[in-house]
Amino acid sequence: IARKNAKNDCLFRFRCAYQPGTLEAVAYNAAGQETGRCAMTTAGPATELRAEPEEAVLRPGQLCYIRLRYTDQNGVLKPTVREPIRVQVTGGRLLALGNACPFNLQGYRTSHTDPYWGEAMAIVEAGTEGCVTLQADSTVGSAVAAVQVHKE
């Protein structure tokens, strides 16, 4: 779209007409060398619920953080989707479920939450050997995260 030099507030504003696609910002240092790059892509029309564990394998009693996200079919986050999410855990114990909203009246000790900007997080404690499974359901769809539990 254009280039601008940094000012004291490090805020850059550009006026442009909206069109779907990818918008990319590129940062350069004083010598003109690229120092950073960030892109945003328009989400597609379809919406799905995803459950993404941070770990692939756990030890008994270990905590697993499972990210719940509303995305399009390509995994692009859909931050305006606010459908409530309900979870059920087997092979472990749900310790907390919630979002990053600074004003959360529901608390974090329930099996349901509203997403904040399209996302929520579940914290699960692994049980004994086997598999810990989180089933997430909403009006949009369902998602499952399964993580193996092994004694070392």
Across the structure, where does each feature detected by a protein language model lie?
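Short, hydrophobic beta-strand segments
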Residues: 12-18, 108-128
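Short beta-strand segments within Ig-like beta-sandwich modules, predominantly Fibronectin type-III
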Residues: 2-8
